[in-house]
Every structure is written in C-alpha cells, then in structure tokens.
C-alpha cells in the first residue's frame, strides 16, 4: 500500500479545458435544442473570456433519450484560436448538423480545450475586421453587465421562449437550486 499524500505530487495537466453539460428536463428535437446549444455557448464563452483565454478545440456531444439510447461526441480543431461566441457556436452547430440522427435529445455537452492566452485577434482576408472588432466589443460589454448586475440582467429574447432553460439555469449554482439567494 502506498501511503504517499497526493499533495506531495506536483501534477500539472498538459492541456486545460472548460466544459458545460446539461441534462434536459424533457426530450428535445433537432429544432428546439439549437436554442439550448446557443445558450450554453453564451455561458462557456463568458467563462473563457473571464479567464482571458481562447480555444482551439471545440468538443460537442449529444445524449439521446433513454427510449432510444446512444448519442455522439466529436471534436473540431480550429485553425485559429477564438473566444468569439458566434464562432464557437457555429462550430458546435456544424458538429450537430453533421452527426445528429433526428432522435429525441436529453443531454447536451460542450467542452473547450487547447486553451491559450487571448493576446489579440487573428485577421484574414475573408472576414470583416469591423465585424470581428464589433463582436469582441459586444461580448465584453454583455459580460461586464452580467458581472455587475447578474446573469439574468441582460438576456436574449430567445431566452423567453418556452424551450429555453437559460433563466432557470442562471438561478442555480452548479446545477442545484440557489433558492435562498434569490428570495
């Protein structure tokens, strides 16, 4: 028996990542789960920007309902790291469109890996510089409002739709009810 303390080992992971997954309260189809994917991308990219990091690897997974079982989990490696909500969401939706089999969905998972410091913006000839700068500024403003006034202080209109989980999820801590904090 090895009686060594775990704290005696200096272990540093080679690659850090952040992730978010959600078990849904009901079965979702391919159309209404897109709202959940976008909401989860908003949450993850806010965390990414708060860490002042960019991601190069986007992993996305779907768990189907128990009635059918199974699911998929795939990764996409970007050429250029990003912290842009729209770009990361589009990557997730690309994976979803490629692998989704039109079955009832009960779980959505997203992970962002290959993290690096956010040192600037990589530009190319095929993208509008103005749009990239605008998106980055918009994301920072929305993040600062949410930090100052709470996650539900500024929401997208789509978060008011019946299939949205964002407002209720924002009232939870680690997926558990934070009732005493809100009442």
Predicted segments, located by residue:
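Acidic, metal-coordinating catalytic segment for phosphate/diphosphate chemistry
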Residues: 78-183
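DNA-contacting surface of Y-family translesion DNA polymerases
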Residues: 1-104
């Amino acid at each position: 028996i090895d009686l060594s303390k775990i704290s005696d080992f200096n272990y540093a992971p080679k690659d850090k990542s952040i992730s978010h997954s959600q078990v849904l309260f009901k079965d979702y189809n391919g159309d209404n789960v897109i709202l959940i994917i976008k909401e989860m991308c908003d949450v993850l990219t806010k965390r990414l920007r708060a860490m002042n990091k960019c991601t190069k690897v986007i992993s996305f997974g779907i768990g189907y309902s128990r009635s059918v079982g199974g699911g998929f989990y795939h990764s996409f490696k970007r050429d250029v790291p990003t912290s842009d909500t729209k770009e990361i969401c589009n990557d997730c939706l690309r994976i979803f469109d490629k692998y989704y089999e039109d079955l009832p969905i009960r779980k959505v998972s997203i992970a962002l890996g290959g993290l690096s410091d956010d040192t600037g913006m990589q530009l190319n000839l095929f993208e509008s510089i103005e749009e990239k700068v605008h998106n980055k500024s918009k994301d920072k403003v929305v993040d600062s409002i949410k930090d100052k006034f709470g996650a539900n202080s500024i929401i997208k209109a789509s978060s008011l739709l019946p299939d949205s989980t964002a407002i209720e999820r924002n009232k939870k801590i680690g997926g558990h009810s934070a009732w005493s904090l809100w009442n």
